[in-house]
Regions:
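Bacterial N-terminal signal peptides
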Residues: 17-28
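Glycan-recognition and catalytic cores of secretory/periplasmic carbohydrate-active enzymes
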Residues: 34-438
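Sec/Tat signal peptide C-region and signal peptidase I cleavage site
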Residues: 29-33
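Bacterial N-terminal signal peptides that target proteins for export
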Residues: 2-19
């Protein structure tokens, strides 16, 4: 772990010394009925410039991953022709989401063209009921296949494109059609309950739709999207376990959700909970996500800023579940731990807490992961990230969920790692009512 004194001299310190003449020119996204305002806000696109190894790693990833080997067309074909295994439809949204965040930083015209072409390709796959899905309407919603999880990432990818690259009305229409189709299919009986849909034992992954529905509500002001978000919260977020209540009651993360305390999906759902709180001011939800943040920070995060493991509590979750990892991190029986998806989502969840509250502990957690876990998981060639990250095991591994495109292995972590890099300039320098925040 890099000492604090060394870290303060790195690329983030360079960003701290930058003055931004255009800080007041913030891009404003409509926020209807907003009850809670953030203590800290991001700067406009292009306002931050890094140097040193952060800049090198970001450019390396853009050149060799987002503009390099990512098989965008093949990922779109999952929506056109179907998928061979569950959840493969997540890949397109993840690849596009990180590309859009990189574009926010670089304004790279070549990257913009790549993103524009693949978005156009995706929109050509819209099904007659308005969905962009890997399965035909008569098989929707496909629970075991991860249909809602896939459609969530379609929404997030399109949302980032619309917000950061091009505000194309066709993209907004695709998002509203996608969301409206979900509302028609999922909900209280006679619709299909959201907590009955998914591949996992408790189906928590489907409730991560909370975030894109809140984003779409903030963009459109359409009450039906807020109503659907409220429905998700009312279900507790998983089958058989009220994750919001467990977080509110300070249940340890590795005991939440029964046999499946899946770290990545749990934090992804609570990212949506923060967005929900901003609009509703629901203090029950706020206490839930603040308790979860504090309990993860104290009980799950290792010396390199990531968490989760397979031993001793949840070997069936393959190292991707909470494991009381802060204590168990040196357990010699661990064979899989610290999934890159977990670390990047922890970083994003921390950025939500930072913006909402201004709590400096969130910065400490973000820095710890960036300097250690994130950069340590990146392939030197820039074309991917390690799946799991043992302290004393293989440096880079692709063993886990994913598929192969020709000779290229693509995993969820290959796709999430670049998002972590793209968040570095996003969080490095922001602003508050009192001025720059570094």
């Amino acid at each position: 772990m890099i000492p604090k004194s060394f870290r303060s001299a790195g690329p983030l310190a360079t960003a701290r010394r930058i003055l931004f003449a255009g800080m007041s020119l913030l891009c404003v996204v409509p926020a209807f009925s907003q009850k809670v305002h953030d203590a800290i806000r991001p700067l406009p696109a292009g306002a931050v410039r890094l140097d040193g190894f952060f800049e090198n790693d970001i450019r390396n990833s853009i050149d060799h991953w987002n503009k390099g080997v990512v098989p965008y067309a093949a990922m779109v074909d999952f929506f056109r022709n179907g998928r061979s295994q569950f959840a493969l439809g997540e890949m397109w949204g993840k690849a596009v989401r990180s590309g859009c965040m990189f574009y926010r930083y670089t304004a790279d015209p070549e990257l913009k063209e790549i993103l524009s072409q693949t978005v156009k390709d995706l929109l050509s796959t819209v099904r007659p009921n308005g969905s962009i899905s890997c399965v035909p309407p008569e098989k929707q919603p496909d629970g075991p296949g991860g249909d809602l999880w896939e459609r969530k990432y379609v929404l997030l990818g399109l949302d980032r494109y619309y917000d950061l690259v091009e505000a194309d009305p066709a993209v907004l229409r695709a998002m509203t059609d996608q969301a409206d189709c979900i509302i028609e299919q999922v909900g209280e009986p006679p619709k299909v309950p959201i907590t009955s849909l998914g591949w996992s034992p408790n189906h928590i992954e489907s409730s991560t739709l909370l975030e894109p529905f809140m984003r779409l509500y903030n963009r459109t002001g359409e009450k039906r999207y807020l109503d659907f978000a409220r429905y998700i919260v009312s279900t507790g977020g998983s089958e058989g376990y009220d994750i919001f209540r467990q977080a509110y009651d300070n249940v340890p993360p590795h005991e939440m959700g029964g046999p499946y305390p899946k770290a990545y999906e749990m934090m992804s759902m609570f990212e949506g909970a923060v967005e929900y709180y901003r609009v509703t001011g629901d203090e029950y939800v706020r206490r839930s996500f603040m308790n979860l943040y504090d309990n993860i920070r104290r009980n799950e995060i290792t010396i390199v800023g990531n968490g989760g493991g397979d031993q001793p509590y949840h070997p069936a979750v393959m190292g991707e579940g909470w494991d009381h990892t802060a204590v168990e991190q040196t357990n010699p029986d661990i064979t899989r731990m610290m999934e890159t998806c977990v670390g990047v989502t922890w970083m994003k969840f921390c950025s939500q807490i930072l913006r909402l509250t201004g709590d400096p502990s969130a910065v400490d957690e973000i820095e710890k992961y960036i300097y250690n876990g994130l950069l340590g998981a990146m392939k030197p060639s820039g074309d991917g990230f390690s799946y799991v990250n043992l302290f004393n095991g293989e440096k880079v591994t692709n063993y886990g969920w994913g598929t192969t495109f020709g000779s290229l292995p693509v995993t969820c972590c290959n796709l999430n790692g670049p998002m972590g890099l793209a968040y570095i300039p996003f969080v490095a320098v922001m602003e508050s009512d009192r001025g720059p925040v570094v």
